[in-house]
């Protein structure tokens, strides 16, 4: 049996995909989840907090398992695969199409919980790759921040460059950018 919080998040995902963030209400989510609005508010103080938790859940769910720290190619491949999975998320497509100002807030004004979690995960993986001698020296947190920016930009801006980058080209160029940023040996 699904617990109430999971049912609410699942219902919120369906409502956002169907109607967008701005048109999704607590009543709609509660109705779809089969719970009272009070149950929703026991878990989250407001719909905005609930929707932030939803986005975090969906993004964290695509984080990949660890790769051997001595294999930069495996790390780059898994970063590109993860970026592609995020790029293809129906939730992200819906937000980009119906609520671009919300996305802009997390690109131009502040980082969200999921971005902080992804950064921390990247920093740990980069530190392990540095210890194995395959990632260049430097502050792992700073390298992770730039890696996050590169991948985030590639994911969010991909629809703008389809004229020049097909799917294979997008993957190839993102991999080259990430490898060039992280590589300790200067391979390009």
Give the ranges of each region predicted by the language model.
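Generic hydrophobic, amphipathic alpha-helix propensity
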Residues: 1-12, 29, 54-58, 62, ...
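Helix-turn-helix
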Residues: 7, 11, 15-49, 53
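Hydrophobic alpha-helical connector segments
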Residues: 53, 64-92, 144-147, 171
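Short amphipathic alpha-helical elements of helix-turn-helix/winged-helix folds
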Residues: 11-15, 85, 150
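Tryptophan-centric aromatic hotspots in well-structured domains and transmembrane helices
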Residues: 43-44, 106, 178
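Hydrophobic/aromatic-rich alpha-helical bundle segments in the mid-to-C-terminal region
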Residues: 94-95, 101, 131-177, 188
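Amphipathic alpha-helical segments used for helix-helix packing
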Residues: 87-109
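Amphipathic alpha-helical packing segments from all-alpha helical-bundle domains
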Residues: 63, 104-132, 141-145
């Amino acid at each position: 049996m699904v617990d109430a919080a999971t049912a609410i998040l699942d219902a919120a995902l369906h409502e956002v995909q169907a109607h967008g963030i701005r048109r999704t209400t607590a009543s709609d989510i509660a109705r779809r989840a089969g719970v009272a609005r009070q149950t929703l508010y026991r878990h989250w103080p407001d719909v905005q907090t609930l929707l932030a938790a939803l986005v975090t859940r969906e993004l964290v769910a695509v984080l990949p398992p660890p790769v051997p720290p001595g294999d930069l190619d495996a790390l780059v491949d898994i970063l590109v695969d993860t970026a592609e999975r995020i790029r293809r998320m129906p939730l992200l497509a819906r937000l980009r199409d119906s609520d671009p100002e919300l996305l802009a807030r997390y690109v131009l004004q502040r980082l969200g919980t999921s971005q902080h979690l992804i950064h921390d995960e990247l920093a740990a993986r980069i530190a392990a790759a540095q210890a194995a001698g395959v990632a260049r020296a430097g502050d792992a947190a700073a390298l992770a921040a730039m890696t996050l920016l590169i991948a985030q930009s590639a994911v969010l801006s991909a629809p703008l460059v389809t004229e020049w980058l097909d799917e294979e080209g997008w993957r190839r160029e993102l991999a080259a950018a990430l490898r060039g940023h992280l590589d300790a040996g200067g391979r390009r």
